[in-house]
Amino acid sequence: MNFSKEEYKTRLKKVQKSMHDKGIELLISHDTANMNYLTGYDAWSFYYAQAVVVHVNAEEPLCWVRKQDSGGAYIKTYLKDENILVYDEKYIHTWPLHPYDNLINIIKEKKWDKLTIGLEMDSHYFTAYCYEKIRQGLPNTKLKDAERLVNWVRVVKSDAEITLMKSAALISQKGMKTAIDVINPGVRQCDAVGEIQKSLFYGTSEFGGEYSSIATLLPTGKGTSASHLTATEEKFVEGEATIIELSGVYKRYHCPMARTVLLG
């Protein structure tokens, strides 16, 4: 685990207080960053249905994932085994079966189907179909938008989080120095970004880096008008500007950095 159990318990209590203030009895969090914040789960499985379910009075949240990824939950979270809920592979790509059928059954079995449920209505990977599944499958619940409840709790960082962000910042600095060194006229963009990525993953002698939530962005020349373009096999041109946007990452904590360089 990247944090102590006490850290996770403190986060849970803050979320539950906000839930109480908003009149939410059960929160279903689909945001992958929120799942990590509440449980420690960080497997690369966001593209399938998964969530953390928080009851306003529970001692621990529930981590709900597909069977294939359940090992990641057992390894990476602080939760008791009984609070890791697994849905079978039969729900994957077998319409009309859907993973949310399983989640709805769990909520019914726990007799939570008459509670006020908060949903992250503007969260990535929570589709309109997922919402309809919940609305139709739990007709006796009151559904409401959680309004980025967990995200707002996350805004105030703990000392432990800030320590990780400072480490990520050092990796960002190293990656940016590499970028400025390797971006030169006549160099292929892909070659430059390869060196940048290498630097970001190598990290420092004290701590290694890891993949980031954003690709290294490297728009150059007229591409600078588009901001979010990635490297191609084209070469850098003397007299043109290049925007560098990257982030060092340490234990999933980012510290992004952006700079503009002019060649020549």
Language-model segment annotations:
Residues A169-S172, M176-A179, Q189, Q197:
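Active-site pocket-lining segments that scaffold enzyme catalytic pockets across diverse folds
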Residues M1-K174:
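A composition/biophysics-driven feature that prefers long, compositionally simple stretches
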Residues G118-S123, I180-Q189:
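Conserved short loop/turn motifs at secondary-structure junctions
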Residues V54, A179, Y253-H254:
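Short amphipathic alpha-helical leader/targeting segments
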Residues S18, K22, G175, A179-V182, ...:
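Short alpha-helical functional segments enriched in proximate histidine and acidic residues
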Residues M35-S45, E147-W152, V156, V187-G264:
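Short catalytic-site patches enriched in acidic/histidine residues
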